[in-house]
Amino acid sequence: MTDEFFNHLHERLLYEGLCDVGFSRIDETVPPDLARYHYAVTLVYRLSDAVVDEIDLSPTYAYFQHYRAANALLDRCALITCEMLRREGAAAYPIAASQSVHDRGDKYTGIYQHKSAAVAAGLGWIGKSALFVSTEHGPRVRLATVLTDAELPCGAKPMESRCGDCNLCVKACPSGAILGKNYVRGMERSEIFDAEKCSRHMKQAFGHIGRGAVCGLCMKVCPVGRSR
């Protein structure tokens, strides 16, 4: 595939509403049943500051709807990406923006971890909250991923955590699920974040907001990517 194709893909996805697109090689993180795919396209959508900034002691109805709408847009962009790659003769496999699977030993994980590809693409790092933190937009983003066997233009190096001594997300978490440790590549998520505790609290405290609980407090307080 040519540079012209990848430039066109990038421009098309930005036109569709994404804020960033990344390319990475994912041999170290792809699960065995998807090992035929050596590359990933990361799709990034920036959430509305106006909506996120309204989050205070709990998520809002507006944030719940915005979260779902962002996921729908990302899923649409993943399908567009797949079709554009298919027309070039490549195989492509879309990973939904938000879909948990229960057959991989962890009911709070997806088919493939979006943030693994995003970090490999050099777009940001994994924060103490276990959220992906974009260098430009902070954690105020949603992600989707397209796996492919097409050779993508990769050159960025994975980023290490830049959270340092900041513990704002740790203090903001109402469930105590964020353990306050900087993520280092190779760590299990459970070493920095208790997904079960987070999910349980969301369902109990915020389940009235809508089907499929959300929170967003840790994302809201992160200083990275805040609008000025």
Model regions: which residues?
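Non-catalytic, usually N-terminal nucleic-acid engagement modules in DNA/RNA processing proteins
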Residues: 1-76
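Catalytic cores of enzyme domains
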Residues: 70-228
